[in-house]
Structures are given as C-alpha cells and as structure tokens.
Amino acid sequence: MTDLTSLTLAEARKGLAAKTFTSLELTDAHLSAIEAARVLNAFVMETPDRARDMAREADGKIAKGDAGPLAGIPLGMTDLFATKGVRTTACSKILGNFVPTYESTVTSQLWRDGAVMLGKLNNDEFAMGSANETSCFGPVGNPWRREGSNTTLVPGGSSGGSASAVAALLCMGATATDTGGSIRQPAAFTATVGIKPTYGRCSRWGIVAFASSLDQAGPIARSVRDSAMLLRSMAGHDPKDTTSVDIPVPDYEAAIGKSVKGIRIGIPKEYRLDGMPAEIEKLWSEGAAWLKAAGAELVEVSLPHTKYALPAYYIVAPAEASSNLARYDGVRYGLREQGKNIIELYENTRAEGFGAEVRRRVMIGTYVLSAGYYDAYYLRAQKVRTLIKKDFEDCFAKGVNAILTPATPSAAFGIGEKGGADPVEMYLNDIFTVTVNMAGLPGIAVPAGKDAQGLPLGLQLIGRPFDEETLFSLGEVIEQAAGRFTPARWW
C-alpha cells in the first residue's frame, strides 16, 4: 500500500470513498509520523485517543453512505482555536493549562464535516511573530534544510507549527490564522499552500484574539485543491461573530482547473524593492509568464501607499493587541502570580506570563493609544489604512481581477538568525503580506520554485473581496507549472 501520509487530501478522500483504506488506518499512519517527528516541535499537544475515536466514527458514516465532505481526514489545529475539553494556550505561559468548555466555530464546522483532530499545533505566542520562535513551547523546526547543511531553519510564523506539520506530512491539512501574513509567509517558507480569506469569510468566534480588525482564519494544505476543500468547510456566516459576513460560501473546488483566459493580473511596481534578491525577482517574472501562457492578461498597476503599510500595521496591530490582552490578569483563569495587593497580582502575572515579544507589542500598543500620542500615531495609521484599501479598490475598479506579488522577501532563515538586536529586521518579513490584512482582502501563497540553496519560495496572489475562487483558479496554474515540492526527510 502507498504510504498513506504522502497522499493529498483529495487523494485520501477518494481512497476512503473507495474503501481502499480506512480512516483509522489513515489516522494511525499520521499519528506514527507525528511520533517520529517530535524533533520538529510542530505539535504542542497530541490527541491520539480522540483522533482514533473520531476516525472510527467517520468509518461508520462512510460505511453507511452518510459521510461529510472531510469524513475521516486527519487534521491539525493551531493552538489559537478553542477545542472543547482539549488544552488551548495560544502558546503562552499566561494561559497555563486552560481547557475551554466550548468549541470554536471553525473547528465545529470541521468536525461537522467529519474531520479528525490529531492534536494542537505550535504557533508564535498569541500569533505575534514571523518565525515561530516566541512560543512558550519553544521554536518549531522547518522540515526543509539548505542543501549540504544541518542548520535547522524557521518555518515562518505565526502559524509555523501548521506549515511544518503539513510540509513534513504529519497531517493532511491544518487550521491557521493570519493577522499580517501568518498563513502565507509560513506556507511560502515550507512549500505548502496557505490562503487568508477575505475578512469576515470565516468566523473568529472561539479563536484567541490578537488584532480583531485584522485576524482571519484559513487553512494550510499540501495543494491548491486541498486548501479549497478545507476553506469550504471553515467558511460561513456565524451570528456569534459580528464581523462575519452573511453571504453564500461557493464550491471553491469547482474553481480548480477553470480557464483563466482573459483574467487581468496586476503587477504592482511598488513591490519591486531595493535590494530584493535576484531569485525572488526571477520567480516573480516566471510566475507572471506562467499565468500569461495560460491566457491571463498582465498589466502594471500602482499601489502608491504600499511603503506606509508596514509601519501603519505595526501601530494598528499592537494597539488592538494591548486592548485584547488586557483580559489576561490572573484572576479568572490561567497563570496567577501572587502579590501583596490586586495591582501587584496583575503586574506579577503579566510580567511572568507574557513573553518578551508580546510584552513589547503590548507596550507599543498602550503607547500609541495614550492620550498624548493617539492622534500622532494611531489615528494617522488608520488614515493610512484607508488609503491602502483605496489603492486596491482603484486597481480593481480598472478591471484588474487579481494581483501577483512575491510572498516573502527571502527564503527561510536559521532559528535565532534574525531580530535578536533589532525587532524591525524580523518585522520586515511581512512586507509583502500586511497590505492584504490592512485592506481585508483574500490572499493565497503558492509554492513556485526554490532558491540556490534548495529552499522553497512562494508567490502571492491577492484577490477582490470575497473572490477566493479566482485565487484558487490562478493558484492552480502556478502549481501545475512549478510542480509540488517535498523536503528530504532528516528527522
């Protein structure tokens, strides 16, 4: 029998339907793979008993012909999604051994469709990071290595555990969240496919909040088709989330293989950065050529406020985080560090419970929201955000259907290599992705090639609001042209 972990989600669905193998066999294969890959530190909690119970239930439904669209498919859940009865910590010491008494909307919908939970995945603490180095459970290793090197690289962040687990064939797909690039950047670093849907497409209810006006859930998967299948189950209106949009969820899988003839692709001149590696520039040109060969039309476009996106993002996101994280005080749940009085209890708990990067962002956020600086920083950043959104609206109003850019400014780097002395060095990893969150648009990262050291590189496609279908159609063109990449196993 084929190694079951090497199948795509779509192939596994066919095999389960044909009864070539059972969900229990598929789940056991992935549980064994997880056990053998603990050095990657992708999972922070494994749930083998629950996984086998869910797999048996899926097998029963498949036998009766009553199976959901993801019946029997083993998935990993980022540790930001509330999972009833299973520890959820946002990879922060401050949440301790918090066990939710409720299920997030997104995970509920995956279980409704028959998916199997293998466990909880590592992520940057409260999703704050671009390398999955800020987790209280330690850094995640990228299954990819530079040719001829034993250096362990970062998988990107904040959803590094999701990307690493999918790339290392530990799960068939994973949930993730994207606030400034946390799905797309790790996907590009690991040769996986990651889509950040339009803001409001997936419910945020039951997901630990970082920056509420920017956070959006999405999947990381092995192929464009797999990500389309997962998004269909994850998306949908939820009255429990006031930002959830009540519009029908299309059959995203139907967009795969659809002709892209006549689709207008914008190439934004502002994304050509000084000092951009020649490999990234070449990959971008190749991606454009593949889309043109498939019948798409290329047009140069201008997004003039792009250069202000990163500084504006690093004002808006920490401001919202400082408000959202005020609830972690050691009183009702999670870590509690005693003090002589209530103020000291708060101070001790937060000082001990939050990691350095989270403390930094909370302090930045508190500063920009303070009375003397609100107008100078936060208000101006929100005005810039409006201008960034308008840049995209103007571009789409001229008939552009999607925009092609690089996903990241480089390939993956070594653990501890960046951001030690200067956090801005790490923040620059988000340079191509933050605009999408600021404008609330959908964006997909697709593997498109490798650098000179054999590390994967990705391209990003940005779409019109709620037009994820076009991104799947275009993403599949890039996937077909570039091929799929898997890392050589070293663990």
Swiss-Prot record:
Q: Where is the active site?
A: S158 (charge relay system), S182 (acyl-ester intermediate)
| GO cellular component annotations of the record | glutamyl-tRNA(Gln) amidotransferase complex
- The source's superkingdom equals Bacteria
A Pfam short name: Amidase
Q: GO terms for biological process?
A: translation
Q: Which SUPFAM superfamilies match?
A: Amidase signature (AS) enzymes (SSF75304)
The catalytic activity, as recorded, is:
L-glutamyl-tRNA(Gln) + L-glutamine + ATP + H2O = L-glutaminyl-tRNA(Gln) + L-glutamate + ADP + phosphate + H(+)
Q: What class of enzyme is it?
A: ligase
Q: Which UniProt keywords apply?
A: ATP-binding, Ligase, Nucleotide-binding, Protein biosynthesis
The EC number(s) given in the record are 6.3.5.7
Q: Which GO terms describe its molecular function?
A: ATP binding; glutaminyl-tRNA synthase (glutamine-hydrolyzing) activity
Self-association or partners: how does it assemble?
Answer: Heterotrimer of A, B and C subunits.
Function in brief: Allows the formation of correctly charged Gln-tRNA(Gln) through the transamidation of misacylated Glu-tRNA(Gln) in organisms which lack glutaminyl-tRNA synthetase. The reaction takes place in the presence of glutamine and ATP through an activated gamma-phospho-Glu-tRNA(Gln).
Q: Which family does it belong to?
A: Belongs to the amidase family. GatA subfamily.
> What HAMAP family does the annotation carry?
GatA
**What is this protein's name?**
Glutamyl-tRNA(Gln) amidotransferase subunit A
- Lineage, please? Bacteria, Pseudomonadati, Pseudomonadota, Alphaproteobacteria, Hyphomicrobiales
